[in-house]
Amino acid sequence: MDPNGKVALITGGARIGQVVAGALANRGCSLSLTYRDSRDAAEKTAGAARATGVKATVLRADATDETEIAAAVRETVKSLGRLDILINMAAVYQKTPNPDGVHWSAIQDANAKSAFLYSIHSAPIMKQNGSGRIVNFSDWLPVTGRPQYKDYVPYYVSKASVAALTEALALQLAPEILVNAIAPGPILAPPNLTPEENAQVLEATPLARWGGAEEIAKTVLFFVETDFVTGEFIRVDGGRHLS
């Protein structure tokens, strides 16, 4: 699919999402950006996209609320005329040493259920267009096969769910819609990372650096532009899964 003249809905457009949005806008793709709390960041991203000559709209939507998700999809089509690409980036990364049902539901809803709901509400529109692309975000660990860190049970399972969802949707929505997933590793260093923790990450990563958001944007563009890859995962982790 050529992104030029198409419309992409991006959920969770902060940080890495800003770079992904910019990459699509530079290819001539108009944008619908959803946010829950970070309106200023979403507006800034939309403004940068408009400066490239494409259209961009900003919508508030709780990624765990089906009514708001459905409304965001409808408003995207109403404002921009179509919907061709869905980038499911909204996510919660939370450490839970003593998880309970509240943790489980909140993290599963934000990470897996949201991707499912956005996909099922977007798919009929894409099928009417004759083609579509859905790009989900899992994590390098569940895609690799085994957990390596304690205290992340709900998060790990939610991202494993996204991986399973990707394969199931790829089969269900073929041949018109291609569904794939990115499994990021060390992309952006957390702001509170200590020098010791940073050194540990670099030592465990064969490429010995943080990837940067641009690497995610490149992979998103690949999944958008390919015409014969679906149900696939790409680990963008600098080889972290090898160590």
Language-model region placement:
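Canonical Rossmann dinucleotide-binding motif of NAD(H)/NADP(H)-dependent dehydrogenases/reductases
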Residues: 2-32
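Conserved glycine-rich Rossmann-like NAD(P)H-binding loop of the short-chain dehydrogenase/reductase
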Residues: 29-43
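Conserved mid-core segment of classical short-chain dehydrogenase/reductases
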Residues: 70, 91-106, 128, 146-154, ...
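Amphipathic alpha-helical dimer-interface segment in Rossmann-like NAD(P)H-dependent oxidoreductases
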Residues: 74, 110-128, 142, 170-175, ...
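Catalytic loop of short-chain dehydrogenase/reductase
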Residues: 92-96, 133-161, 166-174, 186
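Catalytic Tyr-X3-Lys loop
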Residues: 100-117, 135, 155-158, 162, ...
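Short, small/polar-rich loop/turn modules that mediate ligand/substrate recognition or access, typified
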Residues: 174-178, 230-231
